[in-house]
Amino acid sequence: MNQATEPRLTIAVITLNEAKRIEQCLRSAAFADELIVVDSGSTDNTQVLAKRMGAHVFEYTDWQGFGEQRNRLLAHSTGEYIFFLDADEEITPALQSEIETAIATATTDKWEVLWNQVAYGKPLSRMRSTSGVTR
């Protein structure tokens, strides 16, 4: 994790029993100035593993919905830019480069990231998103 005095980029993750995935997820996000995890009451080692990866971990077991957990992430984030990442997702080196370039050039306040669907290491070419909410 970048140890800048004032974080520019926070990567924020919501978790619940993600011990099998959280290290890989956070390892891909290690370039960020700040890693924040809001845990929803994991009963496995998710919190311990996230802390070992350098994340600031906050536990909220009173599940009030996905939106509330996101708001809690925002409340703990100090970065100028916040990137929401799901625990089963990874930031590729190419995406990392795009994120760093976008922040360095800072021509907008919001970016939408398009991603590839991958299963068992292979792209899912017959699957596409038809609609949804920007998040």
Predicted regions and their residues:
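A conserved acidic beta->alpha catalytic loop
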Residues: S28, D39-K51, D62, D86
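Conserved donor NDP-sugar-binding/catalytic core segment of glycosyltransferases
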Residues: E80, E90-S125
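Acidic helix N-cap motif at the loop->helix transition within catalytic regions
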Residues: K20-E23, D44-M53, A94-L95
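N-proximal low-complexity "stem/linker" segments adjacent to membrane-targeting elements
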Residues: M1-S28
